[in-house]
C-alpha cells in the first residue's frame, strides 16, 4: 500500500463536514413538477443555513452542480447565492460530473479549504427531471439563425420552406452517451451478462433497498436530514421521498418486463433507480473554524478519489476502480470500514461492482495487487437502502449519501464510512468519511 495522503490544511486542520440537508426526493412529474433545479437548490441551501445558525457571511464559497443544464440559469451556484440572502460577495461556481457531481463539489470546496483561500463553504447539487430544456432540431436551429440574418420576407420564407415536418418536433435532452450512443440501461445489461448477474439477484437487491429505506423512514432516522418543502399551490407539505415501495414483495418485481433488452434482458424499471427531482447540500469548514463557531462537526473528509474507464463496455464500474484508491489514500482497508454506501444506479451495476471488489483477479490485472480490495460485508452495505429506493436527482445523490452516512456513523458511535458512485462517461468517485 502506498503512503496515505492526509486531507489537512497547512495548519494541520482536518476538513470538517458540519451539517448536511436535502429535500425529499420526488419521482419525475410528481411533487416537484414544474419546480426547476435552481429553485430546489435555493430551498435546500436557504434551509441549511437557517438550521445551522451559521452567519451567512461566514460562508465564503458555494460550489453547486446540475447535470441537466437549464440555459436560462447556466451558473446555478451563483443564482443560489443571489436567491438565498447570502452575502453578495460570496464566490460561487458550478460543476458537473454526471452522477458524481456533488462528490466533485465537495472535493472542490475541500481543496479551497486546504489551499487556505476559504475557511467555510457549501457544496451540493440539484436536478429536475420534470423541468427539462426541451430543444429544437439542428435543422430548425440553423434556419432560425439564418432567418435572423435574412433581409427580406422572401428570403425568410425560402429558408423556412427547406424544413420538413420532423424538423419542427421538439428535441428532449439526450439519454444516451454522446460518444457511444449507449443508454445507461444498455450498459447495465452489458454488466449483467458479463458478470452473470441474474434477474432474481437484481430484484432481490432492489427489494432490499426499498425495505431498508422504508424502515429508515419509519424509525425516524432520516427526519433530521430531510427538510419539509412547500411548493405551489402551497396547500400540502411534501416531507418524505415518494418513490419508496415499502409494501412491495419480490413477486411484484418479477412482474415487470425488461426495459432495455426486451428479448434477453434482466434490467427493469423496478431494479433501476427512477428519474427524480431533488437537491442536497453540505457545509464544510476547517476544523478550527468549526471550533470558533461552536459547532460540532458531523464528521470529517478523510480521502477521495476519482477515476475514469472506457465507455464502450461495462462503463459503470467506477466504484470498483475508485474505492481502492480512496482507501489507500485514507490509509485504511475494507476491514476498517464501519459502513459502505454505494450509489445504486441499477441493481446489475451495483452487484457487478461488489463482485469485482472481492475479486483477486480484478485487483491483480487492474491494480497489480496480490489481494482483492475486499468483500463488502452485507451488514455494512447500504444499511439504510440506496438510490433504487430513494431516487436519483443526478447532482444531489452524492451529498445525500455523505450526509446519510455521517449521521448513521454517529448513531453507531463513530468510525469510518466509504461512499462511492459510478457516473456517465465511465467516471467513478469514492470518499472516505470519519465520524467520532
From Swiss-Prot:
User: CDD domains from the entry?
Assistant: thiolase (cd00751)
Q: Signal peptide span per the entry?
A: none
Q: Which InterPro entries does the record match to this protein?
A: Ac-CoA_C-AcTrfase_FadI, Thiolase, Thiolase-like, Thiolase_acyl_enz_int_AS, Thiolase_AS, Thiolase_C, Thiolase_CS, Thiolase_N
Q: Which GO terms describe its molecular function?
A: acetyl-CoA C-acyltransferase activity
Compartments annotated for it: namely: Cytoplasm
One Pfam short name: Thiolase_N
Q: Which GO terms describe its biological process?
A: fatty acid beta-oxidation
Q: What class of enzyme is it?
A: transferase
Report the PROSITE patterns cross-referenced here. Answer: THIOLASE_1 (PS00098), THIOLASE_2 (PS00737), THIOLASE_3 (PS00099)
What this protein is reported to do is described as: Catalyzes the final step of fatty acid oxidation in which acetyl-CoA is released and the CoA ester of a fatty acid two carbons shorter is formed.
Oligomeric and partner information: Heterotetramer of two alpha chains (FadJ) and two beta chains (FadI).
Q: HAMAP family per the record?
A: FadI
Protein's name according to its UniProt entry: 3-ketoacyl-CoA thiolase
The organism named in the record is Salmonella typhi
